[in-house]
Regions:
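A charge-rich, low-complexity, intrinsically flexible signal that marks solvent-exposed coils, linkers
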Residues: 1-166
């Protein structure tokens, strides 16, 4: 039985609000930025782009970090859980396809991470986060992002967190 992985989703308010999907691989949190956010809709493909690893110390970070010239970064801890990979997740990711089951507070069920074929000149590697046809929602159902926008850590919204930094 593979070792469960720590998994987090942070709502990251940058130029545009997006989700950072994070998985504990080895000693770091691997990350993917999901432009349109996570989805519970069966068969839905969400484009995500690999981003820099994060040290495990920041796993439950929520709040605002001043970034000097670049302004401030706001993070809301949107979901947390352990994920159960089908086998060795690091090895599966290296091959470009990994399946896992999440038991989050918001994201529950099975997903696949699929690496897209990329051109050599591309700076960032694109992946797809694909929701499996398990106990998922259907198209037209309420969007989990609209239904549950609050932090799993503090119950705050992005607006609440922004207000504390003002
Ligand atoms: Mn981000």
């Amino acid at each position: 039985m593979p070792k469960p992985l720590v998994y987090r989703v942070q709502n990251h308010a940058a130029r545009r609000l997006h989700h950072d999907f994070r998985l504990e691989i080895g000693v770091a949190l691997k990350g993917w930025a999901i432009t349109r956010g996570s989805s519970l809709v069966a068969g839905e493909h969400r484009l995500n782009v690999a981003v820099e690893d994060l040290v495990l110390d920041y796993i439950d970070f929520e709040g605002v970090i001043a970034m000097g010239y670049h302004g401030a970064v706001l993070m809301l801890l949107w979901d947390r859980a352990t994920g159960e990979p089908d086998g060795d997740c690091a090895a599966a990711l290296a091959t470009g396809s990994a399946a896992l089951t999440l038991q989050g507070e918001k994201l529950i069920g099975r997903w696949r991470l699929e690496r897209m074929k990329s051109r050599l000149c591309e700076e960032h590697v694109s992946w797809l986060l694909v929701k499996s046809h398990d106990a998922a929602r259907e198209r037209g159902d309420l969007d989990i992002l609209e239904e549950q926008p609050r932090s799993v850590l503090t119950g705050r919204t992005v607006k609440d967190i922004a207000a504390t930094a003002a």
